[in-house]
């Protein structure tokens, strides 16, 4: 190649193609090989080869594939392509001779490759005695470094000794010394030659110290290791080097980082003592061992738990009440209990969290109420399902000796909440099981005991964790499957099934708006009439909650949404009562309605079911026989005994009823409760059966508008029963105008909606004689007269 005097500024064009380099710095007067593979770079090289072969080379700040001007350093080197070679994979191997430093003034083009306006940086330095001394010192250091590196190329040392220019000497030594890429770029950007010599001297001195220490270490440990310990030797070398340089060993750095995190986590003294002990063990373990991973995981769990992190309670009682009312309809008892807790919490800041148990049938909002309580209190919410859990370790955790051991669900839930005072819901607590692996219910005793849970010990953690600030809320469908000891620790709040009035309110205030939102409709597009909602409740659902009601409403809204999307519906849809079958098909359920006329031997009872209440007709018939009692209708054992008691009571009153004893000796009494396929049980039909039998024997009709409930004794006393709320609502729905119930159940009327109480007359009785006087038409004056208390 021809010699060209390209070191003169006027020979370098003002505009140069700029080749971005990754992890490579080119110095002036240095010959360097480059591999070019990017499409833009290949195009740049090809154009340069067809021209003056001059290119600007600047290193990228980050090794991105497609750099922008902001990704490129502004100080670089202009060079000339000496030789190029194309490889089969279309990459180019270049040999480039660096010429002079350049500064990129501005980028003019980015496509098809970078072009920039540049200026050549000229070096003007007088070779003073000080500069000469710095050059000799640098050469001495370079010679020492060469002597410490086996197989160091001798020609590099000779070339360095023949360089007379101070700037070029600094560049040459920097290029051939093991500096990191940022340090090499720093040398390139140091324009002042004296300063450049100083920096290279500093870096070379540091590199020389590292080499001397490495050789010293190598000599010290050479006789102590064998070939199989090569990895250990390298680690020892690295550790010693880092120690001499004042750097920290990665292992030590990890231990220090863990110790710092433990301090920040504010562990209590006992937990901190255990953590320090495990940390000390960790520092002595080889990182590749299984025990190392187990211990590290354990420490991570200790660090991640919210030992001292609490959310601040929202003590604004009015605001909390608004939130509870926004999310749930009615449920006044539950809301009142939460507001009471807030009031006491406001007065006594260190009050322990209550432990509540919501009991009620499915779909009444137990789980969603927990979320609402958390929102009202301003706390985090976490829920775990206990249904089907049979292993105690699910609650208390596994010991760390087991492979894959983890904390129990309580501690996992606390970590998930990231707070030590969340609202913690234990869903389906009545469905806990037990087997040979232990009893989870017994493990929950400690969790739910306010006197013990301030030091709950999970088997995995092995140190106490304070659960006293947590508000635990358990949910259950029934109470009888919950162990008594566990039940005793919880404050039980019953969530009875919703009444028809409540379901109407929930449907209009919550379900319909929510389903409209989920289906992308506005309230201006569809409206439900009250009668239509009532028909859906009565004839298309039979449940205590509102889940199926929401499904049926969603079904109607989907059909309307389809019509709107297809364009067949353009006006507002009003769903009327007669439209419901069109959307949902034939009715799925029927509720009993009152009889059409007063009948002999047919009394109207009131029954409680899991889906609410219903009326129950009891039929009695006197047939030829031998004085036996025949019972049909799939009656349970308690109900059969109640029927026998009712018959015995009526027999004791035959004289008062003007019925001869001979009639019973020649006849059987057949008592039947319709819907024979459905099991029925309980004592509350006693007065109804007695009334039906008395009517059949006396041939006196029973009033069709009156319903009754109550347990009967042999002496005719009427005892209190349960489910009054549901029974009265069923009577109202069936069109009954009067209800007979035990006097001791009078207190239960508080749960009955006022609009229902206004339309029903209530008779409170203590004796079955009163029931017969009220229910049977044309009662004889000879019967013992009583004056039952009456409301209505």
Swiss-Prot record:
Signals that turn on the gene: By heat shock.
Highest taxon listed in the record's lineage: Bacteria
Subcellular location: Cytoplasm
Lon N-terminal domain residues: 16-208
Binding site for ATP: 360-367
Top EC class, one word: hydrolase
Positions of the Lon proteolytic domain: 597-778
Active site, UniProt feature: 684, 727
Lineage per the UniProt record: Bacteria, Pseudomonadati, Dictyoglomota, Dictyoglomia, Dictyoglomales
InterPro entries: AAA+_ATPase (IPR003593), ATPase_AAA_core (IPR003959), Lon_bac (IPR027543), Lon_bac/euk-typ (IPR004815), Lon_lid (IPR054594), Lon_proteolytic (IPR008269), Lon_Prtase (IPR027065), Lon_prtase_N (IPR003111)
Record keyword Transmembrane helix present: no
Signal peptide extent: none
One GO molecular-function entry: serine-type endopeptidase activity
Gene Ontology CC annotations of this record: cytoplasm
Oligomeric and partner information: Homohexamer. Organized in a ring with a central cavity.
Keywords: ATP-binding, Cytoplasm, Hydrolase, Nucleotide-binding, Protease, Serine protease, Stress response
Primary localization class, coarse: cytoplasm
Coiled-coil intervals: none
PANTHER family assigned: ATP DEPENDENT LON PROTEASE FAMILY MEMBER
Family matches, as SMART domains: AAA, LON
Protein name from the UniProt record: Lon protease
Chain's role: ATP-dependent serine protease that mediates the selective degradation of mutant and abnormal proteins as well as certain short-lived regulatory proteins. Required for cellular homeostasis and for survival from DNA damage and developmental changes induced by stress. Degrades polypeptides processively to yield small peptide fragments that are 5 to 10 amino acids long. Binds to DNA in a double-stranded, site-specific manner.
Single GO BP term: cellular response to heat
Swiss-Prot/TrEMBL catalytic activity: Hydrolysis of proteins in presence of ATP
Enzyme Commission designation: 3.4.21.53
Family statement drawn from the similarity comment of this UniProt entry: Belongs to the peptidase S16 family.
């Amino acid at each position: 190649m021809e010699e060209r005097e390209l070191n003169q500024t006027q020979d370098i064009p003002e505009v140069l193609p700029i080749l971005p380099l990754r992890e490579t710095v080119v110095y002036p007067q240095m010959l360097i090989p480059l591999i070019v593979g990017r499409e833009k770079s290949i195009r740049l090289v090809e154009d340069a080869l067809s021209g003056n072969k001059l290119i600007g080379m600047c290193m990228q700040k980050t090794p991105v594939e497609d750099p922008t001007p902001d990704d490129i350093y502004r100080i670089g080197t202009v060079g000339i392509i000496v030789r190029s070679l194309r490889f089969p994979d279309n990459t180019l191997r270049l040999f480039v001779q660096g010429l002079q430093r350049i500064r990129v003034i501005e980028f003019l083009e980015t496509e098809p490759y970078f072009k920039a306006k540049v200026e050549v940086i000229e070096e003007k330095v007088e070779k003073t005695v000080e500069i000469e001394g710095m050059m000799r010192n640098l050469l001495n250091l370079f010679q020492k470094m060469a002597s410490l590196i086996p197989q160091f190329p001798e020609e590099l040392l000779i070339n360095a000794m023949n360089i007379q220019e101070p700037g070029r000497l600094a560049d040459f030594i920097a290029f051939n010394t093991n500096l990191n890429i940022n340090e090499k770029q720093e040398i390139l950007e140091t324009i002042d030659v004296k300063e450049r010599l100083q920096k290279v001297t500093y870096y070379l001195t540091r590199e020389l110290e590292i080499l001397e220490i490495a050789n010293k270490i190598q000599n010290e440990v050479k006789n102590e290791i064998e070939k199989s310990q090569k990895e250990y030797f390298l680690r020892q070398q690295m550790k010693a080097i880092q120690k001499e340089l004042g750097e920290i060993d990665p292992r030590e750095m990890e231990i220090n980082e863990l110790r710092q995190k433990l301090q920040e986590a504010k562990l209590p003294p006992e937990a901190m003592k255990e953590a320090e002990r495990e940390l000390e063990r960790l520092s002595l373990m080889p990182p590749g061992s299984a025990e190392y991973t187990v211990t590290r995981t354990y420490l991570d769990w200790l660090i991640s738990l919210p030992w001292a992190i609490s959310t601040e309670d929202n003590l604004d009682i009015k605001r909390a009440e608004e939130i509870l009312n926004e999310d749930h309809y009615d449920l006044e008892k539950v809301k009142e209990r939460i507001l009471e807790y807030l009031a006491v919490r406001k007065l006594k800041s260190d009050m322990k969290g209550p432990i509540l148990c919501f009991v009620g049938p499915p779909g009444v909002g137990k789980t969603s109420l927990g979320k609402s309580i958390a929102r009202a209190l301003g706390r985090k919410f976490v829920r775990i399902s206990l249904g089907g859990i049979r292993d105690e370790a699910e609650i208390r955790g596994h010991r760390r000796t087991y492979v894959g051991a983890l904390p129990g669900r309580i501690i996992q839930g606390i970590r998930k909440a990231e707070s030590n005072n969340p609202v913690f819901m234990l869903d389906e607590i009545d469905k806990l099981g037990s087997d040979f692996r232990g009893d989870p219910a017994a493990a929950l005793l400690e969790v739910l005991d306010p006197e013990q849970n301030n030091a709950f010990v999970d088997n995995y953690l092995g140190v106490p964790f304070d659960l006293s600030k947590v508000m635990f809320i358990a949910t259950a469908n029934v109470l009888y499957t919950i162990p008594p000891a566990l039940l005793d620790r919880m404050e039980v709040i019953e969530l009875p099934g919703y009444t028809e009035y409540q379901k109407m309110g929930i449907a209009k205030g919550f379900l319909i708006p929510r389903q409209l939102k989920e289906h992308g409709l506005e309230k201006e597009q569809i409206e439900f009439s009250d009668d239509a909602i009532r028909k859906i409740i009565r004839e298309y659902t039979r449940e205590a909650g509102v889940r199926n009601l929401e499904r049926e409403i969603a079904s109607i809204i989907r059909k309307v949404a389809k019509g709107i999307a297809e364009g067949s519906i353009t006006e507002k849809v009003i769903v009327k009562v007669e439209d419901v079958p069109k959307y949902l098909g034939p009715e799925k359920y029927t509720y009993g309605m009152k009889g059409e006329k007063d009948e002999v031997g047919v009394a109207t009872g009131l029954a409680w079911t899991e889906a609410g209440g219903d009326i129950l007709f009891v039929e009695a018939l006197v047939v030829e026989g031998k004085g036996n009692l025949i019972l049909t209708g799939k009656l349970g054992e308690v109900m059969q005994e109640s029927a026998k008691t009712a018959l015995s009571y009526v027999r004791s009153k035959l004289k008062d009823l003007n019925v001869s004893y001979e009639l019973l000796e020649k006849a059987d009494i057949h008592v039947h409760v319709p819907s024979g396929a459905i099991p029925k049980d309980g004592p509350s039909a006693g007065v109804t059966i007695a009334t039906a039998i008395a009517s059949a024997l006396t041939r006196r009709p029973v009033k069709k508008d009156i319903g009754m409930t109550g347990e009967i004794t042999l002496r005719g006393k009427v005892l209190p029963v349960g489910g009054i709320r549901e029974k009265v609502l069923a009577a109202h729905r069936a069109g009954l105008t009067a209800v007979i119930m035990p006097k001791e159940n009078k207190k239960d009327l508080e749960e009955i909606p006022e609009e229902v109480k206004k339309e029903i007359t209530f008779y409170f009785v203590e004796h079955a004689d009163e029931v017969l006087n009220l229910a049977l038409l044309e009662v004889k004056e000879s019967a013992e007269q009583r004056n039952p208390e009456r409301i209505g």
